[in-house]
């Protein structure tokens, strides 16, 4: 539909109206797609993809309702996305996680068109299934969406500090933020060293919790996101 719509302004108008009506109906009836066949892709190859109902609902849920684990609400680590999904299977994220080395941080990926993807939700639809051309550049609309979502998330959760390894300027005020990129690539030796140091310094006066199961907290987070509760 997106491919055909670009043939005329009227077609684009119809598609946008369709997406808006579908969004309103989905929110009213609670009809959202939560599971898809393995290998299904959500192709986001045009500007109009940003208005897709699935994408808009994700952005709204993350910004306004999503709640991370109580164990990881202190330090927020912002990371770039990767072409490979889920992100943790990529070589770049393997290096990021090795440098971070602390399970109490809250890892959130910055991406388009979803805006933000918390690490514990990277396996679910649509985070694990979207496909978008990667250029490394952000347009004003993408940055606006990301910053608005991030502002709401930080405000609601109440992180004490942010370790920013994403390369995106957050524009946030009133919170301690450490830029670990300094204009370098996310995977450079110096950037990774700064990432490791920033995380370590954030917890230098605290001891590691021993009764913390990341897997259990991940499942609880997915349950809260999908079902509104983690009380099993």
Go through each PLM region and give its residues.
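Conserved mixed alpha/beta catalytic, RNA-binding, or beta-rich assembly cores of soluble enzyme
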Residues: 55-58, 67-148, 220, 231-232
